[in-house]
Amino acid sequence: MATHSTNEFRGGLKVMVDGDPCSIIDNEFVKPGKGQAFNRVKFRNLKTGRVLERTFKSGETLPAADVVEVEMQYSYNDGEFWHFMTSENYEQHAASKEAVAEAKQWLKEEALCMVTMWNGVPLSVEPPNFVELKITETEPGVRGDTATGGTKRAKLETGAVVRVPLFLNEGEIIKVDTRRGEYVSRAK
């Protein structure tokens, strides 16, 4: 099994810590004036979602996590699980509420997502960077309301709430950046 030394640690690297797959969020190399250098590492447990911090002596190694990033199509939510399907062999996988986490507000049927798999189980779901969603609820924008561009709250078809310009109305389809949760433009 492959291992990673502390000098290879970087954000996004997947390693095994205490038997669980983890993703490194932040790695800080510390060389004190006296004593051995060490790495202060912040990582997210991919099974539980908890963020932990630990220090490793310089030169220590951790086994690589055997996780796979697979592009899958979102099919449906049955109330308990979110179901995804691979494009190649149409294999179905059910992701738990913990695996979907914040991505659920951007998931629309047939959307392509990156799913992190470990031992055949979905651990995390990353929605596409941009999604096109319909505005289902917003206040009507009044012309002449502001001297400069103003915004209002709009509820989208997936339940997400974003700030949109005053000129947008219910029923319009907009493009949203899922990484920041912000309005980008009207859909073409």
Curated annotation (Swiss-Prot):
The lineage of its organism: Bacteria, Pseudomonadati, Pseudomonadota, Gammaproteobacteria, Legionellales. May be beta-lysylated on the epsilon-amino group of Lys-34 by the combined action of EpmA and EpmB, and then hydroxylated on the C5 position of the same residue by EpmC (if this protein is present). Lysylation is critical for the stimulatory effect of EF-P on peptide-bond formation. The lysylation moiety may extend toward the peptidyltransferase center and stabilize the terminal 3-CCA end of the tRNA. Hydroxylation of the C5 position on Lys-34 may allow additional potential stabilizing hydrogen-bond interactions with the P-tRNA. InterPro entries: Elong-fact-P_C, NA-bd_OB-fold, Rib_uL2_dom2, Transl_elong_fac_P/YeiP, Transl_elong_KOW-like, Transl_elong_P/YeiP_cen, Transl_elong_P/YeiP_CS, Transl_elongation_fac_P. Pathway: Protein biosynthesis; polypeptide chain elongation. It is found in: Cytoplasm. The modification N6-(3,6-diaminohexanoyl)-5-hydroxylysine is found at K34. This is Elongation factor P. It comes from Coxiella burnetii (strain CbuK_Q154). Keywords: Cytoplasm, Elongation factor, Hydroxylation, Protein biosynthesis. Pfam families: EFP, EFP_N, Elong-fact-P_C. Involved in peptide bond synthesis. Alleviates ribosome stalling that occurs when 3 or more consecutive Pro residues or the sequence PPG is present in a protein, possibly by augmenting the peptidyl transferase activity of the ribosome. Modification of Lys-34 is required for alleviation. The keyword Membrane does not apply. Belongs to the elongation factor P family. GO terms for biological process: peptide biosynthetic process. GO terms for cellular component: cytoplasm. It comes from the Bacteria. One of its GO terms (molecular function) is translation elongation factor activity.
